[in-house]
Regions:
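Transmembrane helix boundary and interhelical junction motifs in multipass membrane proteins
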Residues: 17-25, 151-162
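Transmembrane alpha-helices of multi-pass small-molecule transport proteins
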Residues: 42-58
Length: 254
C-alpha cells in the first residue's frame, strides 16, 4: 500500500509542477523501501515509463511545439543513453554494497536536482542562453538519458534546464523535450533490464501497487483544471527531494 501512496503522490505533484514523476519518488523509495537497489531501480523505471506514457497520450492531442526531426534526434539520443545507462549501472552497482550504492546514487541525484534548482532560481537571470543549433539536441538527449537511466530517474529537471540554457527554449518546448527524453530513455533501460533479468521482473508484488499509483496520479494531474506549471509546488517539491536525498546520504555514511 505504501508504494501505491508514494507513487500516486509523487506522480501527481511531480507532473503538476512539471518536474516529472520520479523527482520525488526516487529518493523517497531509497529512504523507506527495504528492497535492494536493483529492485528500487526497476520500480522507479516502471513508474517513470507509466507516467510518461499517460502524459504522451494527452500531449498527442495538441500541436507539438518541436519539429519532428528534432523529436527524432531526442528519441534516438535518449534511447541510446537509456541502454548504456542501464548497462553501466548494472556493472557498477553489482560491485558495491547497499550503503555504498545508496550513497553514490543519492549524491548524483542531489547534484542533478540541485543544478536546475540553482539555475532557475538565480543563474538564469545572469547567464544568457546559448541559442545553440538544435542538432545538439542529440548529444543532449544522450547525456540526460544516460544519467537518467543510470539513476532510474527521468531527469526531467535536468532536461528543462539544458533546453532553456542551450537552446533558449520556451516552457512548452522544454516540457515536450523532457517528456520525449524520459519516455525513450526509460524504454531503452527497460528493454535491457528485461533482457538481463531474462524477462522476469524482481519484486513484482511491489510493482502491482506502485504502477497503478503512478498511472492514477498522472491521470489526475492531466485534469484541465490542474494544467499549467505551479511554481510554488515545484519549488517545494525540489526542496523536499533535495532534503530526502541528503537524509539518504547521511544514512549511508553512518
Amino acid at each position: 500500500m505504501i508504494y501505491l501512496i508514494l507513487s500516486g503522490i509523487s506522480a501527481f505533484f511531480g507532473l503538476t509542477a512539471g518536474l516529472g514523476t520520479t523527482t520525488l519518488l526516487r529518493p523517497l523509495l531509497d529512504a523507506v523501501s527495504p528492497l535492494e537497489p536493483a529492485s528500487v531501480a526497476m520500480l522507479c523505471t516502471m513508474a517513470t515509463l507509466g507516467a510518461a506514457l499517460v502524459t504522451a497520450f494527452f500531449a498527442l492531442g495538441r500541436p507539438l511545439p518541436l519539429h519532428p526531426d528534432e523529436l527524432m534526434l531526442l528519441a534516438i539520443g535518449a534511447s541510446l543513453g537509456g541502454v548504456l545507462g542501464d548497462l553501466a549501472s548494472a556493472r557498477f552497482f553489482s560491485s558495491l554494497t547497499r550503503s555504498s550504492a545508496m550513497l553514490l546514487q543519492n549524491a548524483l541525484l542531489f547534484t542533478i536536482i540541485a543544478l536546475p534548482s540553482v539555475y532557475f532560481g538565480q543563474l538564469s537571470h545572469m547567464l544568457p542562453p546559448l541559442r545553440a543549433n538544435r542538432l545538439f539536441s542529440l548529444p543532449t538527449a544522450f547525456a540526460v538519458g544516460l544519467l537518467g537511466s543510470f539513476l532510474s530517474f527521468g531527469a526531467t529537471p535536468l532536461t528543462l534546464m539544458l533546453y532553456a540554457f542551450l537552446f533558449a527554449a520556451d516552457e512548452e518546448e522544454s516540457t515536450i523535450a523532457a517528456l520525449t527524453v524520459s519516455l525513450f530513455a526509460m524504454t531503452g533501460k527497460l528493454i535491457v533490464l528485461l533482457i538481463r533479468q531474462r524477462f522476469q521482473l524482481p519484486d513484482a508484488d511491489a510493482l502491482l501497487w506502485l504502477l497503478p499509483g503512478a498511472v492514477g496520479g498522472s491521470l489526475l494531474a492531466m485534469l484541465p483544471a490542474l494544467q499549467g506549471r505551479q511554481a510554488g509546488v515545484g519549488n517545494a517539491l525540489l526542496r523536499l527531494s533535495l532534503f530526502t536525498s541528503l537524509l539518504n546520504i547521511a544514512a549511508a555514511l553512518t
